[in-house]
């Protein structure tokens, strides 16, 4: 029976999978399987499994309860008596990587045919070319874990290095739901794997600060004082900044310029005839660090005929802890958000942060196990809209004044990939007289923000930020526009670190300026120097 290897084109043996020049389509394809007994793996299936196993070192599944020597911190339970020094013996009983509470679905894992179309869209595979840092490699690791492999340091590292950008979901011709798989894996890691003490402390800091608007607002005063003192410049010049742990350096550099808080009214009436009553999700980071975006959102919605209700007692929607695998915390936030907007009595909930919008639209799935919440969660998910999605759906009626400028629109992953919203923001920007859109190269590639990724994985995030910043600069545009606060901070900070000055704004701020007749020069100046702009300092090599 003849076997051919895709990508060889009759020019001899193709390079081994995972090596430079290898085709992403791993494995031979048979011309017929009619003579194979039922259940026999095809050549493609056998070769793919063999190739992937070779990449991961031919790790074989372990029997549950099997004794094996493992380093501490693998998530396995230690057995036996302590040594004389009080340290545990190294003989450990291997526990299954995943518990029974919603592990990755084997049926979804089986949907992956290892075709490789995801590889050029995966940020970590693009950076390193490592099979296990690709979607299909991580799916293979999930399969291993389901078969009994423990959650060791290496496996967890590959999962942690995934940005969760969902570009692979967009690229996959087989419709593999990698988003569901990685979102099921992260809570398992948080429950089953013991991280180092320093990492636990840092993660606790992030997830006990950023999802809490009151705590963030309390931080504004000290942070503004720090920015005004220019202490950061001194720390950078003396080299002391480089002595901080990389995650703390990343957190310090990402903080945008803070200005006065522009709080939106609890209720804003429509201009002219009322067309809808909408609720505004203020957001945690958006509401604290980018209050101008919320103010612009309210003005645009009112101009388009909407009564806007911004509930005072709203909090985090659960996106940040949810993406970090902190399931219990995320579900608690989700329930509070549902109650808040049920009480508000709105027709729609409008969101101006891509990560928050994609999370709310998954409430029904997240709360599927709780009968008293499942239907309510699905109801809120159905009425949630991104600001650009909502205005296009409603139909814009407010007059647009000219803004003669070129715009580089940067797709936020959780808008383009997670929600499938690409054309709506572009349509709204093109509807402004004088605006010319510029296309970015590698538009599908994540900028490296990915929720808390740029604080937890600063090195790959920095590399991805530099690629995105270079792509933005290459357009020669007057203004970069995006739809997510994380993307804004990531790209703006990278541009500043590179010594480049480029204005950055949210889509709705451009719409607001056009509706209000703000001169283009004023818009660009505020986007370059106003609140929300980057304060990162050029690296020493460029200063």
Predicted regions mapped to residue ranges:
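A broadly conserved sequence feature marking short terminus-proximal activation segments
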Residues: 3, 61-91, 118-142, 414-417, ...
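N-terminal glycine-rich, Lys/His-bearing helix-loop that initiates the first secondary-structure elements
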Residues: 3, 8, 19, 55-56, ...
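Short, charged low-complexity linear segments at domain edges
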Residues: 79-104, 132-153, 271-277, 291, ...
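Non-heme iron-sulfur electron-transfer modules
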Residues: 80-98, 125-157, 175-204, 500-508
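Cys/His-enriched microdomains
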Residues: 110-116, 120, 160-163, 167-170, ...
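Iron-sulfur cluster-binding cysteine motifs and their immediate structural context
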Residues: 111-113, 117-139, 161, 165-188, ...
